[in-house]
From Swiss-Prot:
It comes from Sus scrofa (Pig). This is Interferon alpha-1. Its main location: secreted. Keywords: Antiviral defense, Cytokine, Disulfide bond, Secreted, Signal. Produced by macrophages, IFN-alpha have antiviral activities. Interferon stimulates the production of two enzymes: a protein kinase and an oligoadenylate synthetase.
Amino acid sequence: MAPTSAFLTALVLLSCNAICSLGCDLPQTHSLAHTRALRLLAQMRRISPFSCLDHRRDFGSPHEAFGGNQVQKAQAMALVHEMLQQTFQLFSTEGSAAAWNESLLHQFYTGLDQQLRDLEACVMQEAGLEGTPLLEEDSIRAVRKYFHRLTLYLQEKSYSPCAWEIVRAEVMRSFSSSRNLQDRLRKKE
């Protein structure tokens, strides 16, 4: 399988502490963005995840093959940007608008948009400092394929409430799991 930990690599850096420790000067408000996104995802839950257990699927979360020790700062931040972009696109579909509370979804979009703008400058800054290519093509492809699988699943399940719950939980679990890579990146410094 293609390098798949690009997903968690990217999500690790959603917290300000991880990004700031990597030398990127983001606004202090960015430090709360990761926590706020997780809180909003939790609040968006409309049905019990237990009622959807038979709908679960292995989406091949891109976290197993991408070694955290080999990730460079600029690459990790570029992956964060890609993950945020893909998450934004996933939750911006017409089916998403019908599935979630409009106010919570708007807050989620707004937070993702702000993080994307903050990271764009950060990615360029880190790429210039390291003088390295921003992303291995396999890593970016793994992230895109992962989100494509989530999108296909939603289509296959006709954007059902359980399908959205599975996708919401998948994204939330990945956001939460990202702290492991954050620790590895901090130890590298």
